[in-house]
């Protein structure tokens, strides 16, 4: 079943937007944070639209979200997200430093029509970072404490749709549930691509999400959803080693450092089967008193970007395409000298129907000045990769279960 057909089976948010009703809305505003400050508020902007819909309808919105994971530097309170949400909503919201305790429950009960209450980082709850089947997650404290206070559940966090966690899959088991506009838009945009059945569709795959990206490449080619694939970043390193077998180069050292040597054989198998459709790097840029392009056989330093010859070859692939799915950068985009490959490819792709996925890709698109030219900008990182790879999303499965169980 195609994504457009699936989303049609799930009630959209309009079914849940009722004056005086309490909605639990799961969004994903997980954002890059440096020195305690949010440096990219793209997801917050996207989800502010959803919260505005709820507020304008006179619903009472209880917002669940997370930031980082326990033990990570970016695991912070959602209080720092509050002013960003208010900025894009152009209205005040409430925040409570609690999730399922007496204070949170009291404030939920006292919400007035049109008000929005942001709860604390849901991953403070240890049960939220444990993945289980939806029926088990429906028995967690989070769901048992909050569900009785709500009339509906709205899932809008596409970027966390691949997680089988309580805030994602638990509530649909016990509450009538709807798909939020961000989530619906994501599935419809990707569904439109898959309806093309690969004709004129190219995937530019970079970054370092190795297992997921490799699986996505395999599934997209196997199912005929893309015609061509061009690989860069760490993914490109693995494919280059699989194709050229340059096992004594700095390339191997970088792959080994990431623990990805076992994936070289899988890349080799994909190249043997789909070699004419997969384009791999032939040169790389290194830092040698500035940017220097080096061919794959002469590489003796850590590669930081695709080289000039590779960039030209990939641009030719893009120019022959109708749709370009861009997931992951080609190099170390934090350094302008090594963002060149990614930015040039993004500029070329902006003349096609461009779909962007992943935080680093979006940041690069902003640098390249092409973000506004994209046909669709996904809020998802790993969820985006897994969706285009054809994996079943736990959130989708839970929402379909809810749609069968409850009549809206």
From Swiss-Prot:
User: Which is a Pfam family this sequence falls into?
Assistant: PGK
Keywords from the named record: ATP-binding, Cytoplasm, Glycolysis, Kinase, Nucleotide-binding, Transferase
Q: Which GO terms describe its biological process?
A: gluconeogenesis; glycolytic process
Q: What is its main location?
A: cytoplasm
Q: Where in the cell is it found?
A: Cytoplasm
Select a single GO molecular function from the record's annotations and give it: ADP binding
According to its record, what are the GO cellular component terms?
A: cytosol
Q: Which residues bind ATP?
A: 334, 358-361
Task: Establish whether keyword Iron-sulfur is in the entry.
Answer: no
Q: In which pathway does it act?
A: Carbohydrate degradation; glycolysis; pyruvate from D-glyceraldehyde 3-phosphate: step 2/5
- EC annotation? 2.7.2.3
Task: Give the signal peptide, or none.
Answer: none
**InterPro entries in the cross-refs:** Phosphoglycerate_kinase, Phosphoglycerate_kinase_N, Phosphoglycerate_kinase_sf
Q: Which reaction does it catalyse?
A: (2R)-3-phosphoglycerate + ATP = (2R)-3-phospho-glyceroyl phosphate + ADP
Q: Where does substrate bind?
A: 28-30, 43, 66-69, 123, 163
Can you tell me which family this protein belongs to?
A: Belongs to the phosphoglycerate kinase family.
PANTHER family named in the record: PHOSPHOGLYCERATE KINASE (PTHR11406), PHOSPHOGLYCERATE KINASE 1, CHLOROPLASTIC-RELATED (PTHR11406:SF23)
Q: How does it assemble?
A: Monomer.
The molecule here is called Phosphoglycerate kinase
What is the source species? Pyrobaculum aerophilum (strain ATCC 51768 / DSM 7523 / JCM 9630 / CIP 104966 / NBRC 100827 / IM2)
